[in-house]
Amino acid sequence: YTFLKGPIVIYGVEEVVHDLKTHVFNNKIWPDFTQIPLPDGSEPTLKFVTVEEGVPFEVLGLQITPIFVNHPVVCTGLLVDDGETTLAFTSDTYRTDRFWAEAGKMPNLKAVFVDVSFPSTEEALAERSGHLTPHSLSEELVKLAAEPLIFAVHIKPFFRTAVIKELSALGNPRIEVANINREYFF
C-alpha cells in the first residue's frame, strides 16, 4: 500500500464490476478501497474501469478485447494484442463458440492459455462448474481456425497428475501445461 504510485485498476465488464463493488469491496467482506486514498491523498487506492464485451481497450500499449465465455458466473476470456503478437486467455470456461471464433480471426495468434481444470472422468463436474477437461479441450480446439501453441492452466491440484497424463495422451505437440515459474516470450 505505502509503495503504490497510483491506484490499483480493475478492468471488467459491467456485471463483474457491479458484483465486485456489491459483494466484495463493500465494507463488509473487504474495505471499499475506492474510498480510501493513497498515502499521498492524490487518488483512491482502487479504481474500477468498466469495459464492453467485444470492444478493445488499451492498457500499457496492449489492445485487450474481452469476449464472454461459458461459465456459471459472468466471465470473459481475453485477446491481448501488442501489434505484432496476439495471445488469448480463456479464463474460466466450459465449451464456448464465440471466443474460439474471435481468437481464430487474429492473424498473429501465437498462443492460447486455456482452462483445463479436471480430468475427462469428471466431465459432469466440469460442465456444472464451467471448466474444460482434456477431452472437451480437444473438441473445442477444432473450432479454432488457427494453430497456436496451447497452454493448459487452472488445473485443479488434486487432479493435476491425471490431467497432465490425459493431455499428453492427446498426442498434440502444440499442447503443454503452463509452468507458473516460467516467463513466456512470443
Regions found by a protein language model. Give the residues of each.
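Core dinuclear metal-dependent hydrolase active-site scaffold
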Residues: 41-102, 184-186
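Active-site-adjacent beta-strand anchor residues
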Residues: 9-13, 89, 153
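Cap/insert and terminal regions of metallo-dependent hydrolase folds
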Residues: 94-185
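Active-site HxH/HxHxD metal-binding segment of metal-dependent hydrolases
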Residues: 1-40
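Hydrophobic pocket-lining residues within nucleotide cofactor-binding pockets
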Residues: 15, 69, 155
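Structural signal for conserved beta-strand scaffold positions within catalytic alpha/beta enzyme cores
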Residues: 12, 48-50, 66, 152, ...
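Short active-site oxyanion
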Residues: 5-9, 85-87, 148-149
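A short helix-to-beta-strand connector/capping loop
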Residues: 6, 37-47, 60, 146, ...
